[in-house]
UniProtKB/Swiss-Prot annotation:
The keyword Ribosomal protein applies. PANTHER family: MITOCHONDRIAL 28S RIBOSOMAL PROTEIN S21, SMALL RIBOSOMAL SUBUNIT PROTEIN BS21. Residues 48-60 have a biased composition (Basic residues). Keywords: Ribonucleoprotein, Ribosomal protein. The gene is rpsU. GO terms for cellular component: ribonucleoprotein complex; ribosome. It comes from Psychrobacter sp. (strain PRwf-1). This is Small ribosomal subunit protein bS21. The lineage of its organism: Bacteria, Pseudomonadati, Pseudomonadota, Gammaproteobacteria, Moraxellales. Transmembrane segments: none annotated.
Length: 71
């Protein structure tokens, strides 16, 4: 869990903004959303495999674009 030390004479708004940024960097919100509902192990494997296929297709597409440019 991220923590923020409030400096002396620092407005609360700025401290809250720093805390939000720290939470975002740590991935707290995405983790909470991911664990909001139970996901069966088979569904999790299916989702991860689909994401891997998507990344692979995107990588192939980027590589094909690099090789076809002739300028």
């Amino acid at each position: 869990m991220p923590s923020v030390k409030v400096k002396e004479n620092e407005p609360v708004d700025i401290a809250i903004r720093r805390f939000k940024r720290a939470c975002e960097k740590a991935g707290v919100l995405s983790d909470v959303r991911k664990r909001e509902f139970y996901e069966k192990p088979t569904q999790e494997r299916k989702r991860k495999k689909a994401a891997a296929v998507k990344r692979y297709k995107k990588k192939l597409q980027r590589e094909s674009i690099r090789t076809t440019r002739m300028y």
